[in-house]
Amino acid sequence: MAAMEANIFCTFDHKLSIADVGKLTKLVAAVVPIPQRLHLIKHYQLGLHQFVDHTRGYVRLRGLLRNMTLTLMRRVEGNQILLHVPTHGLLYTVLNTGPVTWEKGDALCVLPPLFHGPLARENLLTLGQWELVLPWIVPMPLALEINQRLLIMGLFSLDRSYEEVKAAVQQLQTITFRDATFTIPDPVIDQHLLIDMKTACLSMSMVANLASELTMTYVRKLALEDSSMLLVKCQELLMRLDRERSVGEPRTPARPQHVSPDDEIARLSALFVMLRQLDDLIREQVVFTVCDVSPDNKSATCIFKG
């Protein structure tokens, strides 16, 4: 793709004040998502403002962000901004717009900002009814933890009153990562979170069905080769579960004689597909890898991986 096509110009309908230009200049090198890749866009297409709805769930906003085009703010020119669509494998200076510090080697992901707690997003720029809302750029472990807790809270809230859920998940809503503490919003059970919960339940049911019989066979064999305490304890646990299921029922052999090698391999393959599906629910795409962090930790030199 030609270099010129990687540049996007954003114009403002009203003349920017000196203060507004100053605010935007401080955001040079920030990651700015846009809905689609066009050569010329308007300011209201910048960031997440057009999709923010405080009556709807965080999972919805996260899904929309995943489908947006990521750009880097290059410079402010009069009444317009120059954005650049990064190229895979190239080095870029990236501004840290998230709540936590970065470290060399971090795999960074984009997440919508949390709108609750002591580290809720700051006001970057407001023009009339429009406000610039930028994503958080956070290390992968933090993104996984946020997404996992959102899913756990959603599943836990099924068939429970708001009061029960609020009391039980309070400890899940506060996350501390690298000395930064912030709050996950209450789960909103909308169609977006429902899809994730349905996928999780289907995958977990398949894992529970496929894993038990296969795991018992393999753990028993491994325990003969390696008498480590973990394997022994694992075998004891599986045998106890097997006995509990088998009370009053005919004894089932560890590996049913009618299961062919092809069938066993098919079951194993299906099991790992389900495990990957569970992982996909909480994993974010890595967009940058940190090569070097600035002394003030406000930016870093990164390789674009998106």
From Swiss-Prot:
Entry GO CC: host cell nucleus; viral capsid
Membrane-traversing stretches: none
Q: What is this protein called?
A: Triplex capsid protein 2
MF (Gene Ontology):
structural molecule activity
Q: Does the keyword Repressor apply?
A: no
Q: State how it assembles.
A: Interacts with TRX1 and major capisd protein/MCP.
Q: Where in the cell is it found?
A: Virion; Host nucleus
> Which HAMAP family did the record assign?
HSV_TRX2
Q: Which InterPro entries match?
A: Herpes_capsid_2 (IPR002690)
Top-rank taxon:
Viruses
Q: Which organism is it from?
A: Human cytomegalovirus (strain AD169) (HHV-5)
Job of this protein: Structural component of the T=16 icosahedral capsid. The capsid is composed of pentamers and hexamers of major capsid protein/MCP, which are linked together by heterotrimers called triplexes. These triplexes are formed by a single molecule of triplex protein 1/TRX1 and two copies of triplex protein 2/TRX2. Additionally, TRX1 is required for efficient transport of TRX2 to the nucleus, which is the site of capsid assembly.
Q: Does the keyword Nucleotide-binding apply?
A: no
